[in-house]
A protein has these predicted regions:
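Internal alpha/beta loop-helix hairpins
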Residues: 53-55
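Glycine-rich phosphate-binding loops of NTPases
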Residues: 57-88, 92-141
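Pre-Walker A-like glycine/lysine-rich segment at the N-terminus of P-loop NTPase domains
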Residues: 1-48, 59-69
């Protein structure tokens, strides 16, 4: 079993990011402030108990989208407004892998296949209230 692709949307510097993971070795190399740490941070936030997202975790474009909703008397949220962070793993497996942890996700019995695991952090109306409070604090900084 092997992760072959990682995709991230709307997390810090990673607006629409994907990386193909090589068979032997994959290196994440780049200049400062290009998203290397953000990639590891989003994986950690979704896969560990450190899943405390804040306004600062959302991509700057998403923060601007939220800021555009601001009115003089508060923030008005349209019903179709989507505010989320997304992480996706593509995992290839074959008949030699132990599939116990993935068996409920497998839809066919072919020997070579791919399973896609997606994680999404999105805000429901109650969470929007907390986000608005964070946003007011963010705006005052």
């Amino acid at each position: 079993m092997k992760i072959t692709k990682i995709k991230v949307e709307n997390f810090r510097l990673l607006k629409d990011f994907s990386i193909d993971v090589e068979n032997k070795l994959s290196l994440i190399i780049g200049k400062n402030n290009t998203g290397k740490t953000s990639l590891l941070a989003v994986i950690e936030k979704f896969l560990t108990e450190k899943s405390n997202f804040s306004i600062h975790d959302f991509n700057l474009d998403e923060q601007e989208k939220l800021k555009a909703l601001e009115k003089k008397e508060g923030i008005s949220i349209p019903e179709d407004f989507k505010f989320s962070i997304y992480l996706l793993f593509e995992i290839k497996y074959d008949d030699t892998d132990n599939l116990r942890n993935l068996s409920s996700l497998i839809l066919n019995l072919e020997s070579e296949n791919t399973v896609v695991l997606g994680f999404e952090y999105y805000l429901n109306p109650i969470q929007f209230k907390y986000l608005i409070d964070d946003f007011v604090e963010f705006k005052s900084e």
